[in-house]
């Protein structure tokens, strides 16, 4: 095992020397050499599902802005990373090629179905999903609630476009493949790997618009790290897991996020109701609070059977029940430590699974660990 990590460390060192990037795409000095050398036998089987994002972008190498997200295919991504064939038997499939601002429930469904299929057919030992960072935590959170597998599923992206100087995508993809291929990653649910760090989409959130260390865990911490010598998890894998929710084949219901602010009226809530939202998530001030006008409109929505969840626009901390807001009386659900975007995903899945009563929804929000 130690020899394998030493070999991987040496391969990491080759990246700087071998990797050359062009404005129109990726070229590597190592490609011809890799093609001629047969890969080692009995390697873990990794399926890369490509969805687009900055990691699959083209750009001017002199700039990290003005790039075209989703301009590179999954196969081109694999060809851009020397040494992948030494750690796993890897193939790529293209699920979509979009910036993650355009990620949607249809693509989530396609991802989940393909992952389930690959695992049920025993085609793979691990999955890597290349993805934009903007909504990566939402995709990961969704998949973590609908998949039931011990095999690693790892999301990876980049903050710098592929053609820029010192792009972070190739190393991130290499490390994601290492994590997906590692026996240590078994039974850990869906993971996110970027910038030498292993996170859970349950806890991680994007905190910076440009930094390569954008994913942080305000209410927890990372699951582990990847370095030149080893994959280092900070705790053992869980011995028990919550039951996966059914994957809704008919699409996800509409759940709107409304943003609280000073001088807030009821317009956002009323608009959500008028547009047939089945759920409303409040990105509230402080402990998930809002103006009296907004809270009154939310209570009226709850009386109509709409699922109403109080979250917060604050980056850390918990939204607790019945502190400033009378949740029991109003029929609201407290998100605890789930941010608005993850609260929305969970509410969508619960509603699609027929869970709509405030007490049952609240119980589900308390059981996401």
Predicted regions and their residues:
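ATP/NTP phosphate-donor binding region
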Residues: 33-117, 296, 355
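Short, acidic/small-residue loops that bind anionic groups at enzyme active sites
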Residues: 140-171, 177-181, 303-312
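C-terminal non-catalytic interaction/assembly regions of soluble proteins
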Residues: 37, 287-369
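N-terminal secretory signal peptides that target proteins for export/translocation
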Residues: 1-11
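Bacterial N-terminal signal peptides
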Residues: 13-25
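Accessory alpha-helical/coil subdomains and C-terminal extensions
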Residues: 43, 49, 73, 79-84, ...
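Short Gly/Thr/Asp-enriched flexible loops that form oxyanion-binding sites at enzyme active sites
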Residues: 129-151, 290-299
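Internal gly/pro-rich beta-alpha loop/helix module
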Residues: 156-227
